[in-house]
């Protein structure tokens, strides 16, 4: 490969070498302070994310080591979930992880409230939003434990074909 960087196999699961190189160039452009990782502010410089109310949650999900920034490996692994070659299960798990803020494998009433609050802002009162959250939990919670498991989440979301919309063209 000469002077070109090689990447661990687990980083390349859904991208070919040309796509990795393009993502590498994009990462370098985004890394304004040349630190080797992307801060929230650097992520926000992406026009397609600037006005996304869930951008901080996306960054939290990408940031697998929890240091508050996204390094190149985390960037590749995170964006890989949006690859057209990515599978339905992986995309559903990513969508679930946006809501599962404490990473315990369940979406609690409080987590659903927080994420929906990010999306609706002040368009609903907290009382209205809580009513929506409570109804959603009642409908999706098939085993009656008061929270939504991945299986309960995916049973509903799979039918909406969300995985077909979670695509990034590299």
UniProtKB/Swiss-Prot annotation:
Residues that coordinate or bind Ca(2+) 2: 63, 65, 67, 69, 74
UniProt entry keywords in alphabetical sequence: Calcium, Lipoprotein, Metal-binding, Mitochondrion, Myristate, Repeat
InterPro entries documented for this protein: EF-hand-dom_pair (IPR011992), EF_Hand_1_Ca_BS (IPR018247), EF_hand_dom (IPR002048)
Lipidation (N-myristoyl glycine): 2
Broad class of the protein's primary localization: mitochondrion
Region annotation Calcineurin A binding: where it falls in the sequence: 131-136
Domain EF-hand intervals: 18-46, 50-85, 87-122, 128-163
One of the record's GO molecular function terms: calcium-dependent protein serine/threonine phosphatase regulator activity
Site residues (Interaction with PxVP motif in substrates of the catalytic subunit), renumbered to this chain: 118, 122
GO cellular component, one term: cytosol
GO process terms (BP): calcineurin-mediated signaling; negative regulation of calcium ion import across plasma membrane; penetration of zona pellucida; positive regulation of calcineurin-NFAT signaling cascade; positive regulation of calcium ion import across plasma membrane
Compartments where found: Mitochondrion
Binding residues annotated for Ca(2+) 3, in chain numbering: 100, 102, 104, 106, 111
Tissue expression as described in the entry: Testis-specific.
Binding-site list for Ca(2+) 4: 141, 143, 145, 147, 152
Family: Belongs to the calcineurin regulatory subunit family.
Extra information: This protein has four functional calcium-binding sites.
The protein's role, per its UniProt record: Regulatory subunit of calcineurin, a calcium-dependent, calmodulin stimulated protein phosphatase. Confers calcium sensitivity.
Subunit structure: Forms a complex composed of a calmodulin-dependent catalytic subunit (also known as calcineurin A) and a regulatory Ca(2+)-binding subunit (also known as calcineurin B). There are three catalytic subunits, each encoded by a separate gene (PPP3CA, PPP3CB, and PPP3CC) and two regulatory subunits which are also encoded by separate genes (PPP3R1 and PPP3R2). Interacts with SPATA33 (via PQIIIT motif).
Name of the protein in question: Calcineurin subunit B type 2
Organism classification: Eukaryota, Metazoa, Chordata, Craniata, Vertebrata
């Amino acid at each position: 490969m000469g002077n070109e960087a090689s990447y661990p196999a687990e980083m390349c699961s859904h991208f070919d070498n040309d796509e990795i190189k393009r993502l590498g160039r994009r990462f370098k452009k985004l890394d304004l302070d040349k630190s080797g990782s992307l801060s929230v502010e650097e992520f926000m410089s992406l026009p397609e994310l600037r006005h996304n109310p869930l951008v901080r949650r996306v960054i939290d999900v990408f940031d697998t080591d929890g240091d508050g920034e996204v390094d190149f490996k985390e960037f590749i692994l995170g964006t890989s979930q949006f690859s057209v070659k990515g599978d339905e299960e992986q995309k559903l798990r990513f969508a679930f992880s946006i809501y599962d803020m404490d990473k315990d494998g369940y979406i609690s009433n409080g987590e659903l409230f927080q994420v929906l609050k990010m999306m609706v802002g002040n368009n609903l009162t907290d009382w209205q939003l809580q009513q929506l959250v409570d109804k959603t939990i009642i409908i999706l919670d098939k085993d009656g434990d008061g929270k939504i498991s991945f299986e309960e989440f995916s049973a509903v979301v799979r039918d909406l074909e969300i995985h077909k919309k979670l695509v990034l063209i590299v």
